[in-house]
């Protein structure tokens, strides 16, 4: 308890009063005195004192390297010289995007990461993996897949004959079906036949497969010529089922019947056909007289024609032409070297 100092005047002073001197109180800043002697707190205290203490402890353990502490840095000079960019040797760009610790490890600033705000509105719990779609194959796709399936030569020829008119070429049939495809009357009702676009696609697919087999002149062939090809394939198939093979041509015989030369045997037909269908080899047809109404014989392979020419079966020569392309010019067999085509 503070002591009070009391002084008394003289006895004769009747008007004297007691003079009491009270020490003045010292105003102290509570914030400044927080760390002073006798204070309960060692430093500044606030509501975030716990976080501040953690930051102070972390800063003591994790030292950030200042750019001034790095030796050998250069100041920026010219931005470029002669079209070549000049970059000064310093850490200015790195310090803008991150920082180094005392050990030299580099850390990017987390604030620099770009985040799309719309991702926060997505409920990932409701998102489910989409099951695979079961593709339903339509009728048109099924027909397209069937059209691309490799077919035999006989099936191709039969399909072409079904779509062609008498004395009509494949190219002419394509023009006819293509012209009718856009008309209103293209769909034939009650006839049982598909409409013109479907027939056009089928004809185009069959012709493409014929070209892929090596028959490049199929677009100029008529229906009658394709029928002759199909007939030749049918004779070959019938001959393969015959258990009794026909007599082969005797090359050492003194005389050979003209009918044997005109009608190819199954062995000759097998040589005339390629590995599967006979559309890869160069085929020939010939006639004995160079007239428009002369009968044509064939088709025969180049090897068979060369054999007959070498053995003298055509002493006066015959008039030959290639089967592909159709409508070619006839030449005498004496002027043709069939070995060039074998």
Curated annotation (Swiss-Prot):
- Where is the crosslink of kind Glycyl lysine isopeptide (Lys-Gly) (interchain with G-Cter in SUMO2)? 26
| Keyword list, A-Z | Acetylation, Cytoplasm, Isopeptide bond, mRNA processing, mRNA splicing, Nucleus, Phosphoprotein, Ubl conjugation
Annotated segments matching region Disordered: 1-64, 130-150, 177-200
Principal localization reads cytoplasm
* An example molecular function term from Gene Ontology annotations: ribonucleoprotein complex binding
Q: What are its GO biological-process terms?
A: mRNA processing; RNA splicing
Work out whether the entry's keyword set contains Cytoplasm: yes
Q: State if Chaperone is listed as a keyword.
A: no
Q: Which InterPro entries match?
A: CD2BP2/Lin1 (IPR039905), GYF (IPR003169), GYF-like_dom_sf (IPR035445)
Gene Ontology cellular-component terms for this entry are: cytosol; fibrillar center; nuclear speck; U5 snRNP
Identify residues that carry Phosphoserine: 46, 49, 117, 196
Q: Where is the GYF domain?
A: 281-339
Q: Residues bearing N6-acetyllysine?
A: 44
Biological role: Involved in pre-mRNA splicing as component of the U5 snRNP complex that is involved in spliceosome assembly.
How does it associate, per the subunit comment? Component of the U5 snRNP complex composed of the U5 snRNA and at least PRPF6, PRPF8, SNRNP200, EFTUD2, SNRNP40, DDX23, TXNL4A and CD2BP2. Interacts directly with TXNL4A and PRPF6. Interacts (via GYF domain) with CD2 (via Pro-rich sequence in the cytoplasmic domain). Interacts with PQBP1.
Listed name of the protein: CD2 antigen cytoplasmic tail-binding protein 2
């Amino acid at each position: 308890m503070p002591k009070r100092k009391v002084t008394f005047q003289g006895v004769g002073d009747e008007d004297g009063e007691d003079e009491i001197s009270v020490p003045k109180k010292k105003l102290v800043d509570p914030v400044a005195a927080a760390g002073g002697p006798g204070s309960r707190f060692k430093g500044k205290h606030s509501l975030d004192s716990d976080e501040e203490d953690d930051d102070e402890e972390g800063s003591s353990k994790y030292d950030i390297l200042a750019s001034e502490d790095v030796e050998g840095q250069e100041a920026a000079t010219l931005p470029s010289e002669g079209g070549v960019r000049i970059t000064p040797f310093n850490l200015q760009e790195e310090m803008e995007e991150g920082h180094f610790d005392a050990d030299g490890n580099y850390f990017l600033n987390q604030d620099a990461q770009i985040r799309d705000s719309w991702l926060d509105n997505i409920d990932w719990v409701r998102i489910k993996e989409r099951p695979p779609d079961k593709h339903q194959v339509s009728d048109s796709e099924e027909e397209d897949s069937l059209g691309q399936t490799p077919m035999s030569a006989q099936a191709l020829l039969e399909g072409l004959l079904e779509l062609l008119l008498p004395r009509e070429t494949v190219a002419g049939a394509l023009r006819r079906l293509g012209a009718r495809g856009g008309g209103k009357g293209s769909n034939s009702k009650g006839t049982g036949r598909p409409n013109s676009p479907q027939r056009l696609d089928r004809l185009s697919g069959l012709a493409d497969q014929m070209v892929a087999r090596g028959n490049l002149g199929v677009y100029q062939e008529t229906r009658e010529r394709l029928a002759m090809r199909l007939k030749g394939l049918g004779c070959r198939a019938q001959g393969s089922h015959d258990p009794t093979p026909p007599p082969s041509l005797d090359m050492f015989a003194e005389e050979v019947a003209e009918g044997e030369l005109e009608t190819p045997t199954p062995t000759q037909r097998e040589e005339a056909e390629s590995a599967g269908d006979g559309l890869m080899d160069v085929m020939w047809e010939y006639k004995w007289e160079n007239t428009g109404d002369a009968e044509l014989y064939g088709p025969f392979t180049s090897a068979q024609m060369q054999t007959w020419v070498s053995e003298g079966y055509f002493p006066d020569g015959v008039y030959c032409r290639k089967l592909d392309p159709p409508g070619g010019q006839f030449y005498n067999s004496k002027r043709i070297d069939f070995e060039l085509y074998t």
